[in-house]
Amino acid sequence: MLFRSLEVPQNGRKAIHYEHTFIPQVNTGIPSSLDLDNDGKTNGPGDAFGYGKFPGQYGLVVLSKYRIDSRRTRTFQKFLWKDMPGALLPRQADNQPYYSPEETSRFRLSSKNHCDVVIRLTPTTDFHFLVSHPTPPVFDREEDRNGRRNHDEIRFWNDYISPSRSKYVYDDQGVRGGLTGDSLFVIAGDLNADPH
């Protein structure tokens, strides 16, 4: 598709050539060995760390005309939902936690991945391309587990860009904190934002 559309001149305009790519690992389809959707089984697509029938389904890619600084790029694939202060973890109708203690201790916030892709515009100027694809806030029941996860996946970026709120954040390499106050950034992706 890339070569049939993006890199082909269209409507009298020159073709766009993306020399740099970033393809992160994603949580969709990665088996958790837990019954995360409470259907009595542990091997369905709803039991993966992110809904998916196979690892990598619904993955994402960043295409860039500018160099990607892979050394400074960060991923948050394994950040645990419980580690977000005030996390909106779902509850049953009787106010008991929806997820068991074991499930909560292993449940990742990101249904795909959250990535801070550092793109170098000039030798002295770069910006942070903050990409994610939160779970749709539907396909659940009264516990609203997907709606709550979607909320916190979007909230993650709000905290990440706010130095006073990002101290709890850790990336997949164990580095803590978010952006500094003077960082340039763009938030992008299919956020599936719930208007309610």
Regions found by a protein language model. Give the residues of each.
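Solvent-exposed, acidic/flexible segments
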Residues: 52-56, 107-110, 143-154
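Active-site surface patch of divalent metal-dependent phosphodiester/phosphate bond hydrolases
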Residues: 1-95
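Structural recognition of the beta-strand scaffold that forms the well-ordered cores
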Residues: 20-23, 60-64, 72, 116, ...
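Acidic/histidine-rich helix-loop elements
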Residues: 90, 97-103, 139-149
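A Trp-anchored, charged/polar loop motif used as the substrate-binding/catalytic surface
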Residues: 96-120, 158-178
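Extracellular/periplasmic catalytic domains that process cell-envelope and extracellular macromolecules
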Residues: 12-16, 53-57, 108-111, 120-124, ...
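Metal-dependent phosphoesterases centered on the DNase I-like endonuclease/exonuclease/phosphatase
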Residues: 7-12, 20, 137-196
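Beta-strand-turn-beta hairpins that frame and shape the catalytic cleft
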Residues: 65-70, 87, 109-133
